[in-house]
């Protein structure tokens, strides 16, 4: 069995018991802090619209990207396409899929996958959702209403009336739960 080499750690004392202290100083910098250092200023963001680098909340795009991480190798099916369309609709407010958007790409992938015999030639979830947050104009924080809409869309598209474990509906629901705890 191989032994792992650990980088030197700062010694812990009795008063220094927070878990993150054993790894050194932990800090965060917001965009406002960077702007102040550079002499710029940012306008106050709309609280319902996510900003890049937000550490406090989970956006719809980030929830979709989480699906790409958890089920990236899974071929896109109609259930996934319906859930992605519902998520994109909730993020953008547009009921019709945008050309080049996630929903249109997912629907095309599902249709292609139904006609493709070889598993290795099928379009996977990661192919569609890896950069979802960047591809969603107006990405916003996931709410429980957003998650419910996506769960409903995925259920309606399933012959078994089940959502995919670790799929789009699960990721949206997890994001909404995290956001409610904040």
From Swiss-Prot:
- Composition-biased stretches, type Basic and acidic residues, lie in 10-21
Q: Identify the residues that the record assigns to the SMP domain, covering every copy.
A: 58-115, 123-181
Entry superkingdom: Eukaryota
Gene Ontology biological-process annotations = intracellular monoatomic ion homeostasis; response to lithium ion; seed germination
Show the Pfam families listed in the entry.
SMP (PF04927)
Where can this protein be found? Answer: Cytoplasm; Nucleus
* Keywords, in A-Z order: Cytoplasm, Nucleus, Repeat
Span list, region Disordered: 1-51, 145-182
Motif interval(s): Nuclear localization signal (NLS) = 7-11
Q: Gene Ontology terms, cellular component aspect?
A: cytosol; nucleolus; nucleus
Briefly state the protein's biological role.
Answer: LEA proteins are late embryonic proteins abundant in higher plant seed embryos. The function of those proteins is not known.
Q: Which family is it part of?
A: Belongs to the LEA type SMP family.
PANTHER family from the entry? LATE EMBRYOGENESIS ABUNDANT PROTEIN 3, SEED MATURATION FAMILY PROTEIN
Q: What is this protein called?
A: Late embryogenesis abundant protein 3
The organism of origin for this protein: Arabidopsis thaliana
Lineage from the top down?
Eukaryota, Viridiplantae, Streptophyta, Embryophyta, Tracheophyta
